[in-house]
Amino acid sequence: MKSDDKTYTQALSRRPLNVRRLWEEEPVGLFSGRDIFAAAKENRAIVLAANARHPITAKGVLRAAKKHDAAVLIEIAKSEANYCGSNFSNLPEYAVNYSRELGHGAVFAMHVDHYGIKGRDDVMKAVTQMGEVTARGWTSVAIDASHLDDWNNLCATRDVAMHIPPYFGLEVEVGEIKGPGEFSTVEEALYFIGGLNSWGIFPDLIAISNGSKHGTYDKTLGQNEGINFERTKAIADALKPYGVSIAQHGISGTNIETRCSQFAQYGIVKGNVATLFQNIVFGIKMEPETGNAVIEGDSYVKEADRGIPAELWDEIVAWCDGKGMSRKSGDYKKANLAFCDKILALPEKYLNRIVDETEYWTERFIKAFNAEGTAEKVIERVCRRTSWNPLPDRKIIAHRGDYRADNAPTKGGNDGGDYSE
């Protein structure tokens, strides 16, 4: 979309208040997740949510988004912000700067992914941190208290949500995303979303455990993508009265043209991709159909003509060896922070090939997700409202007394693992 388009210019005056406070004079197309999710849902499209573990990822994603007039999300998870160069403080500024380099016109939201809550201390910290992310220009949040049992998940999610501006996009989660074989149930989802509704909390999206996993599917161990579309649709259909759709996590390793292209049929509106974009930065060999990292000889395979230079990859391998990691470990993600500045300082030829490949894969997702043209739909939606505020016109239809600790579907807690991203 052209940054001087009349409707785009009109929509800029209706961006979220926190965005206008920071970038009133900057024609950056940063909007609320509420508007982007609603526009995608209306048009049977899926929004690509790209985890920018390295800031340069955001540039390639925004370039593809502008080229195809597709609304996207740039995101980072709470845990990722502790081991990546991107964090809650700097990623919005990086995204706005990259948008400026492109001449603006890209339509996107800044999404706090997997804001993990594992107990009371995290809830109390969130009271302060939600104010901080608002001040930094974020426009959407995913609360993830799925580590807790259903009753405490409901209570913690409710308490944190009450400290998020209601004009932000809101995603919640029930059932930890662990991989094939352990699925969220319709009963859990109805209890969770009904309970939130009874307190006046209106999520746009719910993340569920439906067979996907975060990170790499290790084919040498027989791991394969196993998204259960039937369970996904059953939950999506059950939640229609609440206006809640599905956020699909763990997409890296999923066939883009044959599987991702089906998502909209099953109530999915948002698609998260993280590890694939990290693979691009590092130049790790990937399956061409899925973006899953190829493992050979118990090791990732570095391709010399992709991503960072081989010499820098050797430094990363040595660093990870020093931390006791296997050479196919998912913990290679923790090298992002240690090597962020070195990557940003690389000669242009390396940065350009990272951005170019990021753009290529983003385009594939946009097309498979039927997301071309969704940026224009977001702008139209923003402009036809009587107010700038995208808070949806939903009603409380559930009764608080029906959602108690004693009738929660599950009473147990987490198994001790960390599946947050």
Task: Name each region found by the language model.
Residues 1-21, 319-421:
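C-terminal extensions of enzymes
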Residues 136-151, 210-212, 254-256, 265-285:
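Glycine-rich phosphate-binding active-site loops on the catalytic face of alpha/beta enzymes
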Residues 103, 238-246, 257-343:
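Catalytic-face loop-and-helix region of soluble metabolic enzyme cores
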Residues 52, 147-155, 174-193, 250-257:
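Active-site glycine- and acidic-residue-rich loops that bind
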Residues 119-132, 180-184, 188-189, 252-267:
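Catalytic cores of alpha/beta
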Residues 88-92, 122-127, 146-168, 217-236, ...:
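Active-site-adjacent beta->alpha loops and helix N-cap segments on the catalytic face
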Residues 46-52, 72-76, 106-116, 139-143, ...:
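Hydrophobic faces of well-ordered beta-strands that scaffold small-molecule active sites
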Residues 76-163, 169:
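Active-site beta->alpha loop and helix N-cap motifs at the rims of alpha/beta catalytic domains
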